[in-house]
Amino acid sequence: MKRLFCLLLTGIVLISLAACQTNTDNSDKNGNNVDNMTTSCTKDSVDEFMSIIGEVELGGLSTGMKLDEEHCYNVTPLSVATQTDIKIFKFSDSCISLALIDGEVYSICESFGGYGFVNAVPWDYDEDGNLDLLVASSWGSGLHRSIISVFNTTTKESIVVYDTSTTDNPSVDLFVAAASPSFSSKDPQDLPVYYQVYSANIEVNGNNLADLSYTATGVIGSVVVENGTPVFKPMDD
């Protein structure tokens, strides 16, 4: 009986240790809860950004809209702001989304007819020492679709990794998050990072299309590097 009690006690201790070592919450590598997230949406550095691009009248299907300070917001995610000097700006009427990188302005995603920029995480996918951007966005008024892409900050080119228009659920909204398992006995810097893609419900706050909140509805896959190229890996692979 004493031996049985000892075995049971040992089992309980081992289970308790395992529970302490493994992080099972829905947090990204920065400790943010990925179940419910809100975009950063401020006026920080907007005047500086507008002094670079100037006020622009839009034409075509966007006639009547313009890139002006009134509709411009800084939507740089915290992880991007703390790890890089990149600033991301979005216009609340047209959803046009632009990045300020090393004093130059670049378009990082399509926007017409969708939310444009949704969110991004920094990721040196090609290991060249420069952090790139893994971006979630959407566009398309006739056929709403979400795009997962990588903006290479060295070549200033965008690589589409996943396009929902080719799937059986083209209108699903997406966001990205960098996640890593957490073990109390290890330095977090030594843990592998997983770049996950979540399906989401997106809400517009205060009729401002630059100010979004999104709630995760599930993990649909992850973005990994194969032969130097970022690729999307579905959950069922």
Model regions: which residues?
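Positively charged n-region of N-terminal signal peptides that target proteins for export
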Residues: 1-4, 8
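Structural motif
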Residues: 95-97, 142-151, 205-208
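Acidic, divalent-cation-chelating loop motifs in proteins
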Residues: 71-82, 120-128
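Acidic, small-residue rich beta-repeat scaffolds with periodic aromatic anchors
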Residues: 21-71, 75, 156-237
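A short beta-strand motif characteristic of beta-propeller blades
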Residues: 105-112, 160
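Short loop/turn segments immediately following the C-termini of beta-strands
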Residues: 91, 138, 200
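Acidic/hydrophobic-patterned starts of short beta strands in beta-sheet-rich repeat architectures
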Residues: 79-87, 127-137, 188-195
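C-terminal motif of bacterial Sec signal peptides marking the signal peptidase cleavage site
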Residues: 16-19
